[in-house]
From Swiss-Prot:
Its main location: secreted. It comes from Ctenus ornatus (Brazilian spider). Pfam families: Toxin_9. Antagonist of L-type calcium channels (Cav1/CACNA1). Disulfide bonds join C2-C17, C9-C22. The keyword Glycoprotein does not apply. The presence of a 'disulfide through disulfide knot' structurally defines this protein as a knottin. This is U10-ctenitoxin-Co1b. Transmembrane segments: none annotated. The keyword Heme does not apply. Keywords: Calcium channel impairing toxin, Disulfide bond, Ion channel impairing toxin, Knottin, Neurotoxin, Secreted, Toxin, Voltage-gated calcium channel impairing toxin. Belongs to the neurotoxin 02 (plectoxin) family.
Length: 30
């Protein structure tokens, strides 16, 4: 249920956006 940006990416508390590259695994939170 992510928008097309990393709005809900709070790795590892939340999963990464399924339709985007998992950049939140590198510490990105937006």
């Amino acid at each position: 249920a992510c928008v097309p940006v990393y709005k809900e990416c709070w790795y590892p508390q939340k999963p990464c956006c399924e339709d985007r590259v998992c950049q939140c695994s590198f510490g990105m939170t937006n």
